[in-house]
Regions:
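Extreme N-terminal tail/first-helix region
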Residues: 1-15
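Structural motif corresponding to alpha-helix initiation and N-cap regions
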Residues: 2, 48-49
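A generic "binding-loop/recognition-motif" signal
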Residues: 47-48, 128
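Short, surface-exposed beta-strand-loop junctions and turns on beta-sheet-rich folds
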Residues: 49-50, 70, 138-140
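Proline-centered flexible-loop/turn and helix-kink motifs
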Residues: 57-59, 109
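Charged, gly/pro-rich active-site loop segments
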Residues: 76-145
């Protein structure tokens, strides 16, 4: 089941990022890419946003990734919803950041101007656990070491 969960992460590129500040949740629709193992997700944000401020205050996050696009035109009971719990991390290594940036541009060419903005920051979410709702009633939970 863990591999199925990782495949959902690797096979998609849009998620909802949930952050928290002072007990108040904040959700953002985000483009993303993942590493090849499905254990880390990379996103981009301006540093002067509510979400980035929340991340700096509280690095614990949740992502929602689903298969509604894959299931378009089918019955909604087949949609899979994956809740990902993880931890925000800055990327300090310039070489790694350049590699991620190139991969991000390849997957999301429509974000070229955003990625070239000096105020934009690429960051990662290190995945800690998954909760998969497969259809309307089958739920599975997995942690990553």
């Amino acid at each position: 089941m863990l591999e199925k969960m990782k495949d959902i992460v690797k096979g998609n590129d849009l998620c909802v990022l949930a952050t928290v500040s002072e007990g108040k949740p904040h959700c953002s629709l985000m483009s993303y890419i993942s590493d090849e193992e499905g254990q880390e997700v990379y996103l981009i944000s301006h540093k002067e946003t509510k979400k980035y401020s929340n991340l700096m205050e509280n690095p614990t996050v949740s992502l929602l990734i689903d298969t509604r696009e894959e299931e378009k035109g089918k019955r909604r009971i087949y949609i899979k919803a994956l809740t990902v719990s993880g931890e925000f991390q800055t990327i300090k290594d310039p070489g790694k950041k350049d590699i991620i940036r190139a991969k991000f541009l390849k997957r999301h060419p429509h974000l070229t101007n955003f990625l070239n903005d000096p105020g934009a920051e690429i960051f990662s979410i290190r995945i800690k656990s998954f909760q998969l709702l497969d259809g309307v009633k089958d739920a599975f939970f997995e942690t990553i070491d």
